[in-house]
Amino acid sequence: MFSDIRLRKADMPPKVAIPTSVDLSQGLYFRHLALEPDTWDAHAHDWGQFNYLTRGVMRLEIAGRTFLSPPHYAVWIPPKVEHFSVNEIPVSYRSVYLSAEISSALPAQACAMTVSAVLRAILDAFSNIDVRVPATAPQKRMAQVALDEIRAATHVDAYLPPPSSDLCKPCCN
């Protein structure tokens, strides 16, 4: 899925800082960025991360497992789990940071998750109006719906449907 583009640090624009603290007073923090190709060094957070892209693909290495995050799926990273990521092409990044308390109701292991149309719409709306910490009553209600959608998201073991071709089946087993 990745092209032959080779990342060279000298050609890279300045890296967006990896947050070391965010306002989780409401339990949720919404992050949205347009990211140029980059490599994000190994790090961990005290909060959980629901990572989603509206454009592009990001490769994440989480606890010894590799995940791809295309626009059809999100990747869940529990609190305090070391991870790093690479995006070889520009991406439109959306992330919901969840407090450790809220994260405790989500999977204990990193996993891919579905993104409902409702959740996608809320994350896009918050990006368009730059909501990071919901401030108004409508924003707080939307944030609660986003949380409900994250909690209800299906965990996905494989991004691709199983092959139907007899020629492909041996390669995928």
Could you tell me what each predicted segment is?
Residues 40, 55-61, 74-75, 83:
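Short beta-strand segments in beta-sandwich/barrel cores
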Residues 38-45, 85-88, 105-108, 135:
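Short histidine-centered beta-strand/loop micro-motifs
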Residues 101-129:
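Double-stranded beta-helix
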Residues 46, 62-64, 89-91:
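A generic beta-sheet turn/junction motif
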Residues 64-79:
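Short acidic-glycine-tyrosine-enriched beta hairpin
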Residues 80-110:
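Ligand-binding loop in jelly-roll beta-barrel domains
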Residues 138-173:
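A short, Lys/Arg-enriched amphipathic alpha-helix from helix-turn-helix/homeodomain DNA-binding modules
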Residues 1-57:
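Generic protein-terminus/edge-of-domain signal
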